[in-house]
Swiss-Prot record:
Signal peptide: none annotated. Belongs to the pyruvate, phosphate/water dikinase regulatory protein family. PSRP subfamily. This is Putative phosphoenolpyruvate synthase regulatory protein. It comes from Ectopseudomonas mendocina (strain ymp) (Pseudomonas mendocina). InterPro entries: Kinase-pyrophosphorylase, PSRP.
């Protein structure tokens, strides 16, 4: 079965997309065409959006699923005329909260991601800059300022995990790729030893690692299954020998990996 899903917002669309994606992921037997439509903030844009929704309904033979965080009532009224199954995220959750808290919500456009929260904004920017500056073992002399240091073989998911934790939690995460030289020495590099309490390991299935490396350097020794299998085996042995906690990233999303790491290490998010 195939259905179209729209994530519609008069802001960035982040809230609608994040919640919508999480809900749709529960229906593995259905193939969704997912379309994000941010900044639907005028009557004309709303009318054009209705045309897109109706066209998708006619094409699929089933009405699209609509996740929206539209605040403006006039724009909402126009969207409600579309041939779609509408899920108004704000009204779904805010109305019960208003009753429980005996208070009216501000119901503001872009409130959840407002730059007005200056301290959070600056924490996020600083964390992202830290992740980029300390990517791939680039600046080990700044590890004393890191909240976490991810270690593992090349291309096992360290960089995207560091960037996600920076964006989502304000965590200052560095990453260090373990090389064949590190494996042959059978011990941690000197630059990591004094930061042992910050280390967390990522590993990956060798066949998945081979596929990822082939995209970067096809038909190379670096991407061969034998090399990937060797590196993964040796790095996992190193993790066990040095008593470094680690997880296999193969079957987890970056969101799941990040959450598991923070729980395991007991690191508190900087963004409140």
């Amino acid at each position: 079965m195939k259905r179209t899903a729209f994530f519609i917002s008069d802001g960035t669309g982040i809230t609608a997309e994040t919640l919508g994606q999480s809900l749709l992921a529960q229906f593995e037997n259905i193939q969704f065409t997912k379309l994000t439509r941010p900044y639907i903030d005028s009557i004309d844009k709303a009318r054009a959006m209705v045309q897109q929704i109706d066209a998708a309904a006619e094409r699929d033979g089933a009405r699209p699923i609509i996740f929206d965080t539209i605040v403006n009532r006039d724009i909402r009224a126009i969207l409600d005329t579309a041939n779609g199954f509408m899920i108004d995220i704000f009204s779904t959750f805010l109305s019960p909260l208003e009753q429980e808290l005996s208070s009216h919500s501000s119901y503001s456009v872009g409130k959840s991601h407002s730059i007005g929260q200056h301290s959070n904004y600056m924490e996020r920017i600083e964390a992202v800059n830290f992740a980029l500056d300390n990517d791939d073992g680039a600046r080990t002399h700044y590890y004393d300022k890191a909240d976490l240091i991810l270690v593992g073989v090349s291309r096992c998911g360290k960089t995207p995990t560091c960037l996600y934790m920076a964006m989502q939690y304000g965590i200052r995460a560095a990453n260090y790729p373990l090389t064949e030289d590190d494996m042959e020495r059978l011990q941690l590099p000197d630059s990591l030893k004094k930061h042992r309490d910050k280390l967390f390991g990522l590993t990956i299935d060798p066949d998945r690692l081979t596929a990822i490396r082939h995209e970067r350097k096809p038909n190379s020794r670096y991407a061969s299954f034998a090399q990937c299998e060797f590196e993964v085996r040796e790095v996992e042995n190193l993790f066990r020998r040095e008593n470094i906690a680690f997880i296999n990233s193969t079957h987890f999303s970056v969101e799941e990996i990040s959450a598991k790491i923070l729980v395991e290490k007991g690191v508190e998010r900087r963004l409140k």
